[in-house]
Amino acid sequence: MTFSNRERRLFLAGLFALGILGAFLFRRKPRLRAIPTQKPFPLPDAAVHPVDPQLGALRFSVDRKKKTVCAHDVTTGRLVWESSGEDRFIIPGAAFPIDLSPDGELWVANVGRKRLERLDPQTGRFIASWQPTEPFGGCCNPVRFAALAGGRFVTMEKGTRRVRIYAPSGALEQELATDLSLSEHDYYLDREKRVVHLYDAARRSHWKVRYDFDA
């Protein structure tokens, strides 16, 4: 096959252009892409480091290793009582929440049995259990809860990823969220005098629930 002079010139010109383009691309420094960063979600210290509930001279806490609830004298630090609940607490994970209602009722989440248990604050004796009419889903719930005035509860549930308010009867009163983040470690509660603050740090969400709905 033979080429005319014009075709040879065009072919050589094409090779020359490709060479220049290749050299330019080889020497060109890669452009750095700016990766947007998100500021940490502002959580109050009381939500990250919650204070153990206290009633009079007694401070209540949980022992995750022994799976018990304890009451200590706030002055001396003496162990007043230790309780295993109705028929022992099943705590398969990190969640073992405890709360004292505005009415002075001590409630503990037996998450493995998917219920709340009420203990006598003075003796640790089991008094009653509570669970919603529609049982908690997942393996172990609720992972966060607050006992409201009048026997109501607000809960945060993993797996089903819900924030709900329940009546004393167990009936659902209000559903605040159905799309919490996947990890329970992003769920936080901060208890103030009249309001409970609930947070999902991963989704940067915040809810406020009054302790007394009628107040």
Regions found by a protein language model. Name each.
Residues S4, L10-A215:
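Eukaryotic scaffold repeat domains enriched in small/polar residues
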